[in-house]
C-alpha cells in the first residue's frame, strides 16, 4: 500500500483533510497537536528537523487504554465469564492483527507521515490506531476515548469472536448448528434457550439486573453463559450426555418404524 505524500503539520490542506476524516469518526479536536503527532512515524523525524516527536508515546498510552477499556467492558457485560474466558476473549480483541485490520478498515494509513523511503505496513497502521486513542484521551478525556474504543474496536470484534467460539463448540462435536432464543419475562427475567434440531438442550432464567433490552446483547450473554457452563464441573459431561441422548432418540425412532417380521 503506497502512502500519500503529506506536508508539515501547519499545512492547511493537511489540516482540512484530517479534520474531515476525524469529523467522520465523531472527533472534534481541541488541541490539534495531539492528532497531528498521532500520525507521525519515527522515520519522518529524520528528514524533518522541525518535527521533534513521533506517535510512539501516544501509541504506548493508547495500547494501555484499549486494554483497560476492553477488559472493563467484558467484565461489566458478561458476568458469567470466568477469568480464563475473559482473558482469552480480551486477547483476541486487542491483539495486533485485529488492531491492524481495524486501522486498515478505517483508512488511517492515508494520513501517516513516513520518510520518503519507508513503506507503510499494516503494523504501522495498527500502531497509529493505538496512537489515535492516546490522542483522544489526552485531548478529550477518558469518556471520549472509551466511546471510541467501544465503537470502533470492541463492537467491531467481540460479536464475531463470541459467535465463532460458540458455534465452533458444536462443530467440534460434529453436531448441527444450534439456535439461540432469548426473551424478557413480565417479572424482568431473561429467559435464554438453546435448541438443537428443535429440542431444548439448555436453558436458564436470570434477573435482568442491567435492564438490557438489546436482543444482540441478550444473545451474547446467553452464549457466554452457556460457554462458561461448559467449562464448569457441571458442564464437563454435557456433550457426551447430549450425544448419548441423541443416539438413544435415533434408536427409538428406528425401533418404532421397524416393520414386524412375519
Curated annotation (Swiss-Prot):
<keyword id="KW-0963">Cytoplasm</keyword>
<comment type="similarity">
    <text>Belongs to the ribonuclease III family.</text>
</comment>
<comment type="function">
    <text>Digests double-stranded RNA. Involved in the processing of primary rRNA transcript to yield the immediate precursors to the large and small rRNAs (23S and 16S). Processes some mRNAs, and tRNAs when they are encoded in the rRNA operon. Processes pre-crRNA and tracrRNA of type II CRISPR loci if present in the organism.</text>
</comment>
<dbReference type="GO" id="GO:0006397">
    <property type="term" value="P:mRNA processing"/>
</dbReference>
<dbReference type="InterPro" id="IPR011907">
    <property type="entry name" value="RNase_III"/>
</dbReference>
<keyword id="KW-0255">Endonuclease</keyword>
<dbReference type="GO" id="GO:0046872">
    <property type="term" value="F:metal ion binding"/>
</dbReference>
<dbReference type="GO" id="GO:0008033">
    <property type="term" value="P:tRNA processing"/>
</dbReference>
<feature type="domain" description="RNase III">
    <location>
        <begin position="18"/>
        <end position="141"/>
    </location>
</feature>
<feature type="binding site">
    <location>
        <position position="130"/>
    </location>
    <ligand>
        <name>Mg(2+)</name>
    </ligand>
</feature>
<comment type="subunit">
    <text>Homodimer.</text>
</comment>
<dbReference type="InterPro" id="IPR036389">
    <property type="entry name" value="RNase_III_sf"/>
</dbReference>
<feature type="binding site">
    <location>
        <position position="59"/>
    </location>
    <ligand>
        <name>Mg(2+)</name>
    </ligand>
</feature>
<dbReference type="Pfam" id="PF14622">
    <property type="entry name" value="Ribonucleas_3_3"/>
</dbReference>
<keyword id="KW-0479">Metal-binding</keyword>
<keyword id="KW-0819">tRNA processing</keyword>
<dbReference type="GO" id="GO:0006396">
    <property type="term" value="P:RNA processing"/>
</dbReference>
<keyword id="KW-0540">Nuclease</keyword>
<keyword id="KW-0698">rRNA processing</keyword>
<keyword id="KW-0507">mRNA processing</keyword>
<dbReference type="GO" id="GO:0004525">
    <property type="term" value="F:ribonuclease III activity"/>
</dbReference>
<feature type="active site">
    <location>
        <position position="130"/>
    </location>
</feature>
<dbReference type="GO" id="GO:0006364">
    <property type="term" value="P:rRNA processing"/>
</dbReference>
<keyword id="KW-0460">Magnesium</keyword>
<protein>
    <recommendedName>
        <fullName>Ribonuclease 3</fullName>
        <ecNumber>3.1.26.3</ecNumber>
    </recommendedName>
</protein>
<dbReference type="InterPro" id="IPR000999">
    <property type="entry name" value="RNase_III_dom"/>
</dbReference>
<keyword id="KW-0378">Hydrolase</keyword>
<dbReference type="GO" id="GO:0010468">
    <property type="term" value="P:regulation of gene expression"/>
</dbReference>
<feature type="active site">
    <location>
        <position position="63"/>
    </location>
</feature>
<dbReference type="GO" id="GO:0005829">
    <property type="term" value="C:cytosol"/>
</dbReference>
<feature type="binding site">
    <location>
        <position position="127"/>
    </location>
    <ligand>
        <name>Mg(2+)</name>
    </ligand>
</feature>
<dbReference type="GO" id="GO:0003725">
    <property type="term" value="F:double-stranded RNA binding"/>
</dbReference>
